[in-house]
């Protein structure tokens, strides 16, 4: 089944679920997308798919009614990052992200680049610490803080720069909501329904646990994309979240 929409970003879902599209072939990605309902989730397009298929893939998803999180994690000099973020806004994406480790001037430039878009601007989110990273990984980079401590420091900088929220692990969510307030959005990868394999994520939670922790948007990949019945899997996840709420 194929759903269509009259605008590039129609925000027709209240679900916090964002499905990560990780496909090597465009046709397979769209075949999967045509099995699910834009009322049940949003979609995330990352570096590999965007490099392979470009902006047209985003348009194809939008034409099917889906809001798109463009997960390119921009990290460059302020002017270059600002132009990239503005280009994403021109594309009509729902959310775009940058690396908080790019610093305050870079994040402020990205924020200012979205001002002309007004209410049509995408959510601007910063990545703190990748969920695959552990304390030993940070130590290798010369960071002596734990992942949780480093993520909180970067999240505070992100809020000070006026961004909409951060990507963080579910374990940080409770503390972040208390520290930064309900309006500061938390986007969390590593969310897997009970019984799913951990994959390459280290700090994981179930959707129900993530919701209880204060996560606003939860990124779920293979448990949905590799499901025999992805539409039903999404409905089951959303039903469990409504019960939790």
Swiss-Prot record:
Family matches, as PROSITE patterns: OMPDECASE
User: Can you say what this protein is called?
Assistant: Orotidine 5'-phosphate decarboxylase
The record's Pfam families line, in alphabetical order, gives: OMPdecase
A molecular function GO annotation: orotidine-5'-phosphate decarboxylase activity
The record's function comment reads:
Catalyzes the decarboxylation of orotidine 5'-monophosphate (OMP) to uridine 5'-monophosphate (UMP).
Family in the record: Belongs to the OMP decarboxylase family. Type 1 subfamily.
| Pathway involvement of the protein, from the record | Pyrimidine metabolism; UMP biosynthesis via de novo pathway; UMP from orotate: step 2/2
């Amino acid at each position: 089944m194929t759903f269509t929409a009259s605008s590039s970003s129609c925000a027709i879902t209240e679900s916090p679920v964002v499905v990560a599209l990780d496909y090597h072939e465009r046709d397979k990605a769209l075949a999967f997308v045509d099995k699910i309902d834009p009322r049940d989730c949003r979609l995330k397009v990352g570096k590999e798919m965007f490099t392979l298929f470009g902006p047209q893939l985003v348009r194809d998803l939008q034409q099917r009614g889906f809001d798109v999180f463009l997960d390119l994690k921009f990290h460059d000099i302020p002017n270059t990052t600002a132009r990239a973020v503005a280009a994403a806004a021109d594309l009509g994406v729902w959310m775009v992200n940058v690396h908080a480790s790019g610093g305050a001037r870079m994040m402020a430039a990205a924020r200012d680049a979205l001002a002309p878009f007004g209410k049509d601007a995408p959510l601007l989110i910063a990545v703190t610490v990748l969920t695959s990273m552990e304390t030993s990984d940070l130590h290798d980079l010369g960071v002596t803080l734990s992942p949780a401590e480093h993520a909180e420091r970067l999240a505070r900088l992100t809020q000070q720069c006026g961004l909409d929220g951060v990507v963080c692990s579910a374990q940080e969510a409770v503390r972040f909501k208390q520290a930064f307030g309900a309006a500061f959005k938390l986007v969390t990868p590593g969310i897997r329904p009970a019984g799913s394999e951990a994959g390459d994520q280290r700090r994981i939670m179930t959707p129900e646990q993530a919701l209880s922790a204060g996560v606003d948007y939860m990124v779920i990949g293979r448990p949905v994309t590799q499901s025999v019945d992805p539409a039903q899997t999404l409905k089951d996840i959303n039903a469990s979240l409504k019960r939790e709420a």
